[in-house]
């Protein structure tokens, strides 16, 4: 394949097919483990799953949450579209049951499905994003739980930081620019320097709590309640997060 052909194929890829690669790991490798621990504790305290409950971390990434749940003795599986992230997670945690897949088509059935750290809203249309909820509803056992940790659009609009700069090394800097365009938060990500020169984009479609609850209900998941942060504060219109959970009836 020529360089021109490779460039054309790259340009045809969706942002989420490009971005979750080695550079993603470099930038986000040391994400706040404290937040992950808080959310896992909140999940366990709220849903109180049995130790033999089958749990799926949808869009598990490099396995942060899977590892924590596994260490607590739970039967956890993880699915992610990125072959690289799944491979890295398996190398670091060989005991975990992780596999590559698309969140719009979930194989198997589970007692609990988790969508953590804004792993929703990746697709351009509402119909495609709703397919994720539809797939979750079809893959939950009766009485099973769905836990969705998402942005709160109202809070985001008030607090959006237009630009941040991160120095990965003396020769590589990452510039991230953010804006909201047509109900989608768009992040332009550039790696610039002597030993890095890459450009990515991240796009997340914004949904209110009411939007999410409507999709839950449409696909057989009864919304129960929502938290506003990882400490378990009750959800408010100005909360930082919308952490919604519901049960398949």
Report each predicted region and the residues it spans.
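Conserved class I S-adenosyl-L-methionine
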Residues: 2-50
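Short conserved AdoMet
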Residues: 48-50, 107, 124, 141
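Class I SAM-dependent methyltransferase SAM/SAH-binding core
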Residues: 56, 63-105
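A short acidic, Gly/Pro-enriched loop at the edge of an enzyme's catalytic core
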Residues: 104-113
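A short SAM/SAH-binding and catalytic strip from SAM-dependent methyltransferases
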Residues: 112-127
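A short glycine-rich, Lys/Arg-flanked "PGG" loop and its adjoining helix->strand segment in the class I
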Residues: 130-142
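SAM-dependent methyltransferase
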Residues: 147-215
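C-terminal lobe and adjacent flexible extensions of AdoMet/dcAdoMet transferase-like proteins
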Residues: 211-249
